[in-house]
Amino acid sequence: MKKQHSKISNFIQKIISEDIQNKKITHVKTRFPPEPNGYLHLGHAKSICLNFDLAQEFKGTCNLRFDDTNPKNEDTCYINSIIQDIKWLEYKWHNKIRYASLYFNKIYQYAIKLIKKGLAYVDQLSPEEIRTFRGTLTTSGIDSPYRTQSIEKNLNLFKKMKQGKMLEGTACLRAKIDMASNCITMRDPVLYRIIFSKHHQTNKKWCIYPTYDFTHCISDALEKITHSLCTLEFQDHRKLYEWILKKIDISCNTHQYEFSRLKLEYSVLSKRKLNLLVNNKVVNGWDDPRMPTLSGLRNRGYTPSSIKLFCKKIGITKQENTIQLSFLESCIRSDLNPIAPRYMAVIHPIKIQICNLSDNYEEILNIPNHPTKPNMGCHKSIFSNTLYIDQNDFYENKSELLKKLAIGKEIRLRYSYVIKAHKIKKDQNNNIKTIFCTYDKNTLGKNPKNRKILGVIHWISEKNVLPARFFLYDKLFTIQSPETVKNFLQYINTNSLVIKYGFVEKDILTNISTTAYQFEREGYFCINKNFSITKNLTFNRIVTLKDKIK
């Protein structure tokens, strides 16, 4: 088997490469095993990209398997969302979608096998007592009084559990390993528990369900996964993973390897904390564009290739580190910059009146859709006597240092003429209503002689405007590491969404199917498809520009 790339970029690639060279394996098989109890986020994207890309690189296969072992928290809506997200990332899993529940009969038989070998027992301690008996990092655990039950009694009790003759929480099946182990995971972990809930795949066939730890390794073995990849919090579970596979005598060549989980600035990636954001109505659902979920990022305007570029660039290591938000933003900029057509949008409009032009004057200007790609063509704009510029581009007190329009100062309108401000008109609240200017007709595409013009600003003609709403998104938290604080909801950025009403060029309607636009000097935007394009045209700001020309 030949690799597609000779360059080794992470330790897992190196392990796989060595396994192939040493003929430990002949075919690489990975898997992405989400629990269908929530929506995928950026942390999951890291795992998705790792597993699918490794399989592709080494010409192997990657399975999609739902680890559906807890019907209380699972739902088909999560399954559908996960499938949609993986398809959106443009990955294809091997053959059909798999479910751990398809293996429940086999897993049950393996549990019986452990009981018969004296390696599992039915414990009737309460969940609270089990936690207490397990001990701590500094104290050994205590044997359950049910640990020494006969094999026959354990088989009978486990059968009663399966038949629904025991109440939820009154009994569980535990592995008999070592209550004095330094690894708490190995202190007689629970293998099966009673759950009287309808399962989305098996309906009411089962009332006992295997735990994640018991199911996961067996599912990997049954699917002949060669490299089972998970995050570092499962490092201590590897001993149990290997113990189970060894004790049930299953033929397999699968091994678990761990890598660091993703941590991102100004974000939380804990499913519990994301759930709190939704339930406390901090955000408008799991697909809110401020959320780090894949559905949220998709609604924000992030592209599959930008997410995959991000996951590739952050790399795979065992070292825990927090990724800067700017790193993610640079990936979407890199992706959109070559393809996004340029338009002008005025988000904070203020009126400009050109005094030396008549009311009926119109001049058609051809504006390039991309500054470096002539093949992307042009669109038409109108220059007239009434324009709109951004409020932030006018400074009432003249300053030669600021590249802004001011009374007595000149500035260039992008792709157009140089204008000079002479006076302003204010409303009753002392807000500037109109700026009266003149234009220099000899400055189209060239600078005036003997005059230095500082600054270029964007604009739109009143005869070429399309009213629009702009959703300006920002960081959801005011602190860099909200994951590390107890009361993280106290640090919500109340300005994470600011709504503005302004204008965009009419010609944008001819490019309505475009993935994203660059609004010059403002950032990258996409159309918010939750609102009518004809009645309530709304744009989401995906990301600001790295360097604004102000």
From Swiss-Prot:
Its EC number is 6.1.1.18. It is an enzyme of class 6 (ligase). ATP binds at residues 35-37, 41-47, 231, 261-262, 269-271. SUPFAM superfamilies: Nucleotidylyl transferase, Ribosomal protein L25-like. Gene3D superfamilies: HUPs, Ribosomal Protein L25, Chain P. InterPro entries: aa-tRNA-synth_I_CS, Gln-tRNA-synth, Gln/Glu-tRNA_Ligase, Gln_tRNA_ligase_bac, Glu/Gln-tRNA-synth, Glu/Gln-tRNA-synth_Ib_cat-dom, Glu/Gln-tRNA-synth_Ib_codon-bd, Rbsml_bL25/Gln-tRNA_synth_N. It is found in: Cytoplasm. GO terms for cellular component: cytosol. L-glutamine binds at residues 67, 212. Disulfide bonds: none annotated. A motif ('HIGH' region) lies at residues 34-44. GO terms for molecular function: ATP binding; glutamine-tRNA ligase activity. A motif ('KMSKS' region) lies at residues 268-272. GO terms for biological process: glutaminyl-tRNA aminoacylation; glutamyl-tRNA aminoacylation. Keywords: Aminoacyl-tRNA synthetase, ATP-binding, Cytoplasm, Ligase, Nucleotide-binding, Protein biosynthesis. It catalyses: tRNA(Gln) + L-glutamine + ATP = L-glutaminyl-tRNA(Gln) + AMP + diphosphate. Belongs to the class-I aminoacyl-tRNA synthetase family. This is Glutamine--tRNA ligase.
